[in-house]
Curated annotation (Swiss-Prot):
Gene designation: rpmC
Keyword Ribonucleoprotein: yes
GO cellular component terms listed in the entry, alphabetical order: cytosolic large ribosomal subunit
Protein name (record): Large ribosomal subunit protein uL29
Domain of life per record: Bacteria
């Protein structure tokens, strides 16, 4: 997800997005542990998306 798209969202929407990303990250980690994940790059993408959302939440909290 692009940072520009995330900046347009409200704090509630960002919190919902963060929750969804953390669930997705958990599911991907479980797939890695069981040897089912073929696309390992998805872990990196989700981890960075989580960081983007958290950064924006901190920016909005400080403003």
């Amino acid at each position: 997800m692009k940072a520009k798209e995330l900046r347009e969202k409200s704090v509630e929407e960002l919190n919902t997005e963060l929750l969804n990303l953390l669930r997705e990250q958990f599911n991907l980690r479980m797939q890695v542990a069981s040897g089912q994940l073929q696309q390992s790059h998805l872990l990196k993408q989700v981890r960075r998306d989580v960081a983007r959302v958290k950064t924006l939440l901190n920016e909005k909290a400080g403003a």
